[in-house]
């Protein structure tokens, strides 16, 4: 019985942490040795600091953007969200100077979790959709 209660407590903490991360992108919810991989480009970000820098660049430097979550699943050791990366292109991205164009790009991220923190992230981002929107 005690083990079941502890599992429920960990799941509750994990859900709160993942929900908070999806809302804020605060890397305190990311393990120090976490790894993110962008499956479309092969780019890999190793460690909390590198992941934080990538998130800051995407959400605040290249774009003024946010993630709009349309679906999510959170378990004790896995999480997934599907949604849209929505915002405005305000800084250099992939050699393209700021266009000030609105963007709305489908995104899905799958996470491996450990002790309530994100340990691995696999990013599925439709870069071709983004590039079309920046070119229009």
Where are these regions (language model features)?
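C-terminal and inter-domain tail/linker signature
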Residues: 1-136
